[in-house]
UniProtKB/Swiss-Prot annotation:
Organism whose genome encodes this protein: Escherichia coli O157:H7
Inducing factors: Negatively regulated by H-NS. Positively regulated by IHF and EcpR.
Taxonomic path: Bacteria, Pseudomonadati, Pseudomonadota, Gammaproteobacteria, Enterobacterales
InterPro entries associated with the record: EcpB_C, Ig-like_fold, PapD-like_sf
Protein name (Swiss-Prot/TrEMBL): Probable fimbrial chaperone EcpB
Family: Belongs to the EcpB/EcpE family.
Signal peptide as annotated in the record: 1-20
Underlying gene: ecpB
Keyword Chaperone set for record: yes
Length: 222
């Protein structure tokens, strides 16, 4: 899932991460016991940037996800939604979930519009195209159900998420294939109703370990 989230974000941006505003992690999670989230963004360039931020709700964070309507207009709020970010400066963007307190996990796209300040000022006077100096970056925010039910099944190296909230799962230990070295590690996000088989770690070995996070709680599985 993490690979799909990264691919989605890169497809949205149309540019490489090294060329864009630093918006931190591609995917962010708001746990069921929290209604706020903070993301730090940084302008690592030598010129000021004009940043505008927009939110969209998605049917899924995967490649086939579609933009859908929010349950209420103020379901997810943020501040600031627009700012001028000086060269080499940072800013904290805060998100507030005010949607239904139900058993449904919700997914949002955070769209960051980044433009060089000098070009933005020129646009106001001349409206000239500045496509080469601007960027549109997409990241994902997952809001866990307010009534989270964490359940899973594990058998023969495969984890299945039978609950209603995304799990972060991992395996570590001896590599399944000698060509991969002696020690291997795998990390994935596992959405509700999905299964994942570990393919690099020999989970059948006595030294092979499987674990997961339920929100901030670490759970050993094997």
């Amino acid at each position: 899932m993490k690979k799909h989230l990264l691919l989605l974000a890169l497809l949205l941006s149309g540019i490489s991460p090294a060329q864009a505003l630093d918006v931190g992690d591609i995917s962010s999670f708001m746990n069921s016991d929290s209604s706020t989230l903070s993301k730090t963004i940084k302008n690592s360039t030598d010129s000021g940037r004009l940043i505008n931020i927009r939110l969209e709700r998605l049917s899924s964070p995967l490649d086939d996800g579609q933009v859908i309507s929010m349950d209420k207009p103020d379901e997810l709020l943020l501040t600031p939604a627009s700012l001028l970010l000086p060269a080499q400066a940072s800013e904290v963007i805060r998100f507030f979930y005010k949607g239904p307190a139900d058993e449904k996990e919700r997914y949002y796209r955070i769209v960051w519009f980044d433009q060089a300040l000098s070009d933005a000022q020129r646009d106001n006077a001349n409206r000239s195209a500045v496509a080469t100096a601007s960027a549109r970056i997409g990241t994902i925010l997952v809001v866990a159900p307010r009534q989270a039910n964490y359940h899973f099944q594990y058998a023969n190296g495969t984890l299945t998420n039978t609950g209603n909230a995304t799990l972060r799962i991992l395996a570590y230990g001896p590599c399944l294939k000698a060509a991969n070295g002696k020690e291997c590690k795998e990390n994935y996000y596992l959405m509700p109703g999905k299964s994942r088989r570990f393919t690099r770690v020999d989970t059948a070995d006595n030294k092979g370990r499987v674990a997961l996070w339920q929100g901030d709680k670490f759970i050993p599985v094997k």
